[in-house]
Amino acid sequence: DRWVWSGDAIQSYLMNYYLFFDSESVKRTIWLLRGKDPVTSHSNTIMDYTFYWFLSVYDYYLYSGDRQFVNQLYPRMQTMMDYVLGRTNKNGMVEGMSGDWVFVDWADGYLDKKGELSFEQVLFCRSLETMALCAGLVGDRTNQQKYEKLETTFWNASKQALVHNSINGVQSDAVTRYANMFSVFFNYLTPERQQAIKHSVLLNDSILKITTPYMRFYELEALCALGEQETVMQEMKAYWGGMLKEGATSFWEKYNPEESGTQHLSMYGRPYGKSLCHAWGASPIYLLGKYYLGVKPVKEGYKEFSITP
C-alpha cells in the first residue's frame, strides 16, 4: 500500500517520536497530506482522516516544540477547518455527507456509519482544541475564542458507555469501542466514567472486537492510560506474537487470530489483497516507549518531561 493515508501516518509519526525522531519526514508528510487550497474534499476523502491530520499537528508540536512549523501551516489549517465547519449539521455535529467516506475501521461485523457517530465527534472536538491551541500560538485571538466555543453527549448511564451513534436526535442502543477508548486517553471523562468504560467496554468480550492493528493501537493505549499495562503486555504478545508465529517478517494491515492459512492473506474481496507491511502495524514501539519506559513530554519539545517506568 503506497499511498499516503492520514490515519496511517499519524500512527507512524507517534512511533517515529519514540524510535527515530525524524522530524523532517513528519513535516513533509503533514504538508503532503494537506495539499493545496481550495479544499474540495476530506483528507484521502475520509472524514476521520481529516481529523487525524489536525491531531497530527497537535502531536508534532507537543513532541518537537516547533512553533515555526505551526506558523507556516496555520493558514492551511484554517481553510481545512472552514471546510469542516461548513459541513456540520443543524446540531453543529459532523456526519457523512455526499462524497465523504466515513471509515472508522475495518470491522469484522456490522459497523453503522449513519447519523452522528460519537467517534467522529470526539475526533472533531480534539481537532477544534488543536485549532484553538495553534490560534493562540500564532496570536489569532479572535479565532482562538471561536474554536474554544465550538468545543462541546452520547453518554448512556444504563450502559455505562458512550453509544455508537445518534440518528435524528435519538441515541442508538449500539455500543462500540471506538469513541469510548479515544475519550479515555483524551481525558474527556471523569475518573468514574473512565473506570466504567474499562469494565463495560474495553474488558467486555461481548462488545464488537477489533481485528486491525490500526485500532488495537488506540484500544491498548486506552488500557495503558487506565493502568492496565500487564493486560496490554499479554495482548501485545498474543496479537503481534500471533503474526510472528504465522511467519510475519513485518506487521500486517489486519490480523484476526481466529483465521488460518491463506485466510490471513485475503482482503477487499481479493484472495491476496491484504497489505503485509502496513504503516499502522507497529504500535508496540509507541506503547512501550510511552507507557512502559514511561517517557512523555509534559510541555512542548520536552521542555518538561516525565519518566515513570
What are these regions (language model features)?
Residues 233-309:
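Non-catalytic C-terminal accessory modules of carbohydrate-active enzymes
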Residues 17-30, 61-81, 89, 132-155, ...:
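Structural helix-adjacent loops and short alpha-helical linkers that scaffold large soluble proteins
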Residues 15-19, 183-187, 286-293:
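Short, hydrophobic/amphipathic alpha-helical patches that form generic packing surfaces
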Residues 5, 22, 26, 46-53, ...:
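Active-site-proximal structural scaffolding
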Residues 36-52, 85-152, 156-221:
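The feature captures the catalytic groove of carbohydrate-active enzymes
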